[in-house]
C-alpha cells in the first residue's frame, strides 16, 4: 500500500473545528478544506459569517468550500455571491437540489457563467453528475462532490460510479471529481484508485490515517490482543 504522500488524489480536511483546521492547514499533506452546515452546527458555531471570515484570515492559500444554507434559490444566489467575495480561495458549495427536490442546476449554470468557483454537493447519481457537467463553465474551476460513502451505505459499491463520474467530467479540465462522505481510511486509497481528483476526509479519520497507514499487521494484531487484556483486567472480570 502506498504512503499517503505518494497518492495522486488531493486530500482535503472535512470539518469546522477551528483548531483542527489550523493544525491540518500546517500539514503539507492537506491540500484544502471543506465544511458544511451540519459540521458547523456540530462544532457549536452560531455565526456563519464570523466563523468563515475568521478562518479565511488564517487559511489563505488552500481552497476552502463554504456552503450556502438557504432553501430558496434566489437567496442561495445572494448568499453565494456574498461568500464568493470573501476570499480568492473560496469555493461556494451549492446542493444539487433544495429540500423540495427542485434542481439547482439553473443556479449552478448562472453562477458558473458569472465566474463563481463552485462545489456542487450532495450528489449521488450519475444523472446528477451529467447535469452538473452540462451546467458548469469550462473556463471556471469547479468541484463535483459525489457522496461515495452514502452510496456504500446502501450496499452499493461506489467505485464503478466514481470511475464513470470521472469519464463524464473528462471534457471539463477545470472540474474536479471529489469523493465525499469518507467512512474509513481505505476510502482514501479507493478514491485514488478510481482517479478522483480530491477526497475530503473528516478530521478523526485523517488522524487515524496518519497513524495507521502502512502499519505492520502482525503488530496491529498484538496491539489488539493487548487492548483486550487491558480492558478485561480493568473490568475485573472473573469466572
Feature names for model-found ranges:
Residues 2-30, 34-110, 114, 148-151:
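Active-site beta->alpha loop and helix N-cap motifs at the rims of alpha/beta catalytic domains
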Residues 36, 47, 75, 91-92, ...:
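Non-transmembrane, interaction-prone segments in cytosolic or luminal domains
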Residues 41, 50, 128, 208-209:
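Flexible domain-boundary/linker segments
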Residues 102, 106-109, 116-207, 213-235:
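Catalytic alpha/beta core domains of metabolic enzymes, predominantly
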Residues 238-239:
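C-terminal extensions of enzymes
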Amino acid at each position: 500500500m502506498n504512503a499517503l504522500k505518494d497518492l495522486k488524489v488531493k486530500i482535503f480536511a472535512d470539518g469546522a473545528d477551528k483548531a483542527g483546521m489550523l493544525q491540518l492547514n500546517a500539514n503539507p499533506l492537506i491540500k484544502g478544506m471543506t465544511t458544511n452546515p451540519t459540521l458547523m452546527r456540530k462544532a457549536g458555531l452560531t455565526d456563519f459569517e464570523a466563523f468563515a471570515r475568521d478562518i479565511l484570515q488564517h487559511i489563505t492559500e488552500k481552497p476552502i468550500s463554504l456552503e450556502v444554507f438557504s432553501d430558496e434559490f434566489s437567496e442561495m444566489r445572494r448568499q453565494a455571491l456574498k461568500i464568493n467575495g470573501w476570499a480568492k480561495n473560496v469555493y461556494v458549495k451549492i446542493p444539487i437540489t433544495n429540500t423540495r427536490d427542485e434542481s439547482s442546476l439553473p443556479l449552478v449554470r448562472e453562477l458558473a457563467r458569472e465566474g463563481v468557483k463552485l462545489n456542487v454537493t450532495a450528489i449521488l447519481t450519475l444523472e446528477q453528475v451529467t447535469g452538473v457537467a452540462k451546467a458548469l463553465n469550462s473556463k471556471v474551476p469547479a468541484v463535483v462532490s459525489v457522496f461515495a460513502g452514502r452510496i456504500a451505505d446502501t450496499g452499493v459499491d461506489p467505485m464503478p460510479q466514481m470511475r464513470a463520474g470521472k469519464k463524464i467530467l473528462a471534457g471539463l479540465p477545470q472540474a474536479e471529481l471529489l469523493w465525499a462522505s469518507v467512512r474509513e481510511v481505505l476510502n482514501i486509497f479507493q478514491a485514488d484508485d478510481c482517479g478522483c481528483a480530491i477526497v475530503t476526509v473528516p478530521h478523526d479519520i485523517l488522524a487515524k490515517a496518519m497513524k495507521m497507514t502502512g502499519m505492520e499487521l502482525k503488530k496491529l494484531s498484538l496491539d489488539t490482543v493487548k487492548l483486550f487484556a487491558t480492558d478485561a483486567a480493568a473490568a475485573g472480570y472473573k469466572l
